[in-house]
A protein has these predicted regions:
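N-terminal catalytic or cofactor-binding beta/alpha core of small enzyme domains
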Residues: 1-116, 123-134, 139-151
Length: 151
């Protein structure tokens, strides 16, 4: 399963949905592509029961380098200098905390993130984030293929 997390109407927060759009028709049979705004219960509902969930998101960093990509394998909430770019106050960190409490984590959770430049209202990714979309899609596809066919 690949989950594009974000809001296409908040500039670079649309990176996750943009990657999912690039993956349409390219993922192996049985791999589900999902879009969500990052609300924790919707994320948990999407990945519950999945052997592998790959989440694609935009992040804010304390010392940002827009377009820089990160990959995390999560079994606990994110810490440090990156934060999800949720436009409504909740996001991936909250979903992981809640899923751990409820024992509803996927078998493996991989996050591919890109550092955002602009999270203001508006459509369209900034040039540096847009330039990272193809590389993110390739990285996600590699993780999905390495995991083998969905159960």
């Amino acid at each position: 399963m690949v989950i594009g997390l974000g809001n296409e109407f908040r500039r670079d927060d649309g990176a996750g949905p943009a990657v999912v759009a690039r993956l349409r028709g390219r993922v192996p049979p049985g791999v589900e592509l999902v879009l969500t705004d990052g609300e924790p219960t919707r994320l948990i509902e999407a990945w519950t029961g999945a052997a592998l969930a790959v989440v694609v998101d935009a992040v804010r960093a304390d010392q940002p380098q827009p377009g820089r990509m990160h990959r995390f394998v999560l079994d606990r909430p994110l810490t440090g200098t990156t934060r999800t770019a949720s436009s409504h106050g909740f996001g991936l960190d909250d979903a992981v905390r809640l899923a751990l409490t409820l024992d509803r984590m996927p078998g493996r959770l991989v996050v591919h993130a890109v550092e955002a430049a602009d999270l203001s209202q508006g459509q369209g990714l900034t040039p540096l984030v847009a330039a990272a979309v193809d590389d993110l899609a390739r990285a996600v596809l590699s993780d999905v293929r390495d995991a083998g066919p969905p159960a």
